[in-house]
């Protein structure tokens, strides 16, 4: 359906297991059917499991064939499933580790099985953002285990219902810093961890990737002295869709703004720097709507 369009459709599938490890996605798969292994001889285990589920949770699904087969499929060891995904050269990431329905069953996100899967290179990324949820703990796990940082909208209905009706709303997305717009380049970038998440106008990622987005978005468009004064008028341009929040961190005096100011999407903000001696601008700022680690802004 995307033929002749700029849209790139990438094959993928979800791999669901009881937490831990939880929900996992595999993209760039070649045959999703090979990631399902149903052994009918284990039906008694399925019956016992379904019998133990809360009735109010499964009542509307109890007669659906997919419920029974889904539980059967989940009995296949996760390591074997992910090894098949690896054989298909798929990119695999851990979904919504901080999702409330899973978190309630455990006092921590990270378990030994997750670490084992990381160490075997069977999981390559982790969602630090899912829909309206952001997890500092998942962000730290990504940094500690060098996982690709992922953010998704997890939209099950219409995007308008969840996002676009809000003022300045946008869906949570993963910005992929690929060499070009091809499936191969996108896949290479994901495996190399070259991503930044854009969530509620916040950029989240590893320092080098976030800095690349900032450098590509913001620039000094013009700088000139105001009349015969030593006040330098500086025009800062933002060519991106994000609204940047900047805080001056080098002690320079901003005369027409507080030391915290914003640069609107596709806009220009003018600031006046006092006691300037040159039109060469070297302004130190923290980017307040970006994080390169939990509670850490890039400078």
Task: Name each model-derived stretch.
Residues 1-91, 95, 103, 127-139:
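A metal-dependent hydrolase metal-coordination microenvironment
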Residues 19-30, 102-299:
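Charged catalytic cores and adjacent phosphate/nucleic-acid-binding surfaces used
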Residues 99:
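Glycine-rich phosphate-binding "P-loop"
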């Amino acid at each position: 359906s995307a033929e002749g369009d700029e849209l790139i459709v990438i094959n993928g599938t979800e791999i669901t297991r009881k937490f831990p490890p939880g929900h996992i996605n595999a993209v760039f798969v070649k045959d999703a059917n090979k990631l399902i292994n149903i052994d009918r001889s284990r039906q008694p285990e399925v019956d016992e499991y379904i019998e133990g589920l809360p009735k109010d949770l499964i009542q509307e699904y109890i007669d659906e064939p997919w419920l029974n087969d889904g539980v059967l499929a989940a009995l296949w060891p996760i390591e074997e499933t992910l090894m098949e995904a690896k054989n298909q050269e798929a990119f695999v990431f851990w979904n919504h580790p901080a999702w409330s329905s899973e978190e309630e069953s455990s006092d921590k996100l990270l378990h030994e099985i997750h670490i084992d899967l990381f160490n075997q290179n069977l999981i390559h990324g982790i969602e630090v953002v899912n829909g309206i949820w952001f997890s500092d703990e998942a962000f730290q796990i990504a940094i500690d285990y060098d996982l690709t940082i992922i953010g998704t909208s997890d939209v099950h209905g219409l995007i308008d219902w969840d996002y676009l009706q809000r003022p300045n709303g946008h869906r949570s997305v993963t910005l992929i810093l690929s060499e070009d717009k091809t499936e191969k380049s996108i896949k290479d970038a994901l495996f190399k961890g070259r991503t930044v998440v854009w969530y509620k106008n916040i950029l989240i990622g590893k320092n080098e990737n976030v800095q690349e987005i900032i450098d590509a978005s913001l620039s000094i468009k013009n700088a000139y002295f105001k009349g015969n004064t030593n006040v330098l008028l500086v025009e800062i341009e933002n060519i991106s869709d994000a609204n940047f929040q900047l805080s001056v961190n080098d002690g320079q005096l901003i005369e027409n703004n507080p030391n915290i100011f914003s640069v609107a999407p596709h806009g220009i903000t003018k600031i006046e720097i006092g006691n300037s001696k040159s039109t060469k601008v070297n302004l130190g700022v923290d980017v307040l709507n970006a994080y390169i680690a939990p509670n850490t802004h890039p400078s």
